[in-house]
Amino acid sequence: MTNFTFDGAHSSLEFQIKHLMVSKVKGSFDQFDVAVEGDINDFSTLKATATIIPSSINTKNDARDNHLKSGDFFGTDEFDKITFETKSVTENKVVGDLTIKGITNEETFDVEFNGVSKNPMDGSQVTGIIVTGTINREKYGINFNQALETGGVMLGKDVKFEASAEFSISE
């Protein structure tokens, strides 16, 4: 069994969504945690739970961030966390239950395991995992949008994300 200790200082969770049909808005969640258990040498034994604090959303625009925290989007007063719990892990895919605003759907994402390395700063063994995917926000009750005069809508329904998580590991 491998012991995994999440390193939030060397991890990130970023997203992007189409805006006004012509560009993308990018942002991040600044507070999240990932708990992993299992044997790093046997992917089938790995189980993970990610917990994201939606009120930590950061798009570098306070007014937009406040709107995203409102009931139009994440409703952070009522829903204080987003979770992802794995059901299965392979070398390049992860399947699990994603819960946003109390709505749970099974999702499949791409995963990249980057092996094990020795940290030259403290001698610890570390590993990294990068998870990427696309989420249809409307499946989670995040339906806010506005029609554009030129056709189309203000916001795309698909949100692309990349989560990069680093862990100290020990046996």
Curated annotation (Swiss-Prot):
It comes from the Bacteria. PANTHER family: PROTEIN YCEI. Belongs to the UPF0312 family. It comes from Staphylococcus aureus (strain bovine RF122 / ET3-1). InterPro entries: Lipid/polyisoprenoid-bd_YceI, TTHA0802/YceI-like_sf. This is UPF0312 protein SAB2563. Pfam families: YceI.
